[in-house]
């Protein structure tokens, strides 16, 4: 079993670009068919580690979904980010959905 460093709804930073992001899905290993998208995907070590679907905002404030290796991410200090409130709202919404009891028939 592979343990992931980050969880759903957690806010993270891209280590190289510094962009704030929110984890929306986790894969135990690289799972895209096209390895030419990212040089990190060609590394066997990185391919075998967890990969994350992360929603971020680019320099223009546009929302983008990225697929990043665990090694490309760092922890983000919990708290509000007034410069990117939509990412705070997304993170809170995901965490709330994970904690809410599910209705059963």
From Swiss-Prot:
Protein name (Swiss-Prot/TrEMBL): Heat shock protein HspQ
Compartmental location: Cytoplasm
Similarity comment: family membership: Belongs to the HspQ family.
The entry's keywords: Cytoplasm, Stress response
Function recorded in the entry: Involved in the degradation of certain denaturated proteins, including DnaA, during heat shock stress.
Pfam families reported for this sequence: YccV-like
Species the sequence originates in: Erwinia tasmaniensis (strain DSM 17950 / CFBP 7177 / CIP 109463 / NCPPB 4357 / Et1/99)
GO cellular component: a single term: cytoplasm
Lineage of origin: Bacteria, Pseudomonadati, Pseudomonadota, Gammaproteobacteria, Enterobacterales
InterPro entries: Hemimethylated_DNA-bd_dom, Hemimethylated_DNA-bd_sf
Encoding gene (name): hspQ
A GO molecular function held by the record: DNA binding
